[in-house]
Amino acid sequence: NWNDTYMVTANMRADGSSKLAPHHRWGYFPSAAAAWRISSEPFMKGTKKWLDDLKLRVSFGTAGNNNIPVGQLTQEYQAVTGDPTLWVNGFNTMWAPSSTMANPNLKWETTITRNLGLDFTVFDGKLSGSVEGYINTTKDLLIKFPVSGTGYTSQYRNMGETENKGLEATLTWHAVNKKDWGIDFSGNIGFNK
């Protein structure tokens, strides 16, 4: 933070998960944000009568997801109850392979978020609002995929990508602001694709 005009923050997160393949076990997820209080600049002095605050902000961040059951890297076996009807190599057995096929190459599902926003306050704090645009992308989705014809029912895989983007706007009018009570009117609108 420099002179309450330029603000920057950054973060690095490292997550490890035994649910994922050894060569993909660690995920590194950086994030950063910056803001510029435009209203503090000398060239904005002519707006002081009506503009209280104007701030532009931008952010970028990543996050990981490993929300799958434990034991998807190697083939699991499950106990068979009742009279064993499963034969392996000519011998009946009380244990059967899990219906989910193992996948030794699973890695982190990663979500990337990008935001650009503008916040403002005008007329001695009577009116405030913000406008924000965003793009969110999720890569390497962890999906339980059907694998018919293999003897198994499904397998967890990293596949696919999703993206959503949108625009949001908020406006608040502080109609009454007394010592012990107040009245505010707020509205927002959003578009998402």
Model segments located where?
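Extracellular/periplasmic, surface-exposed regions of secreted and cell-surface proteins
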Residues: 1-193
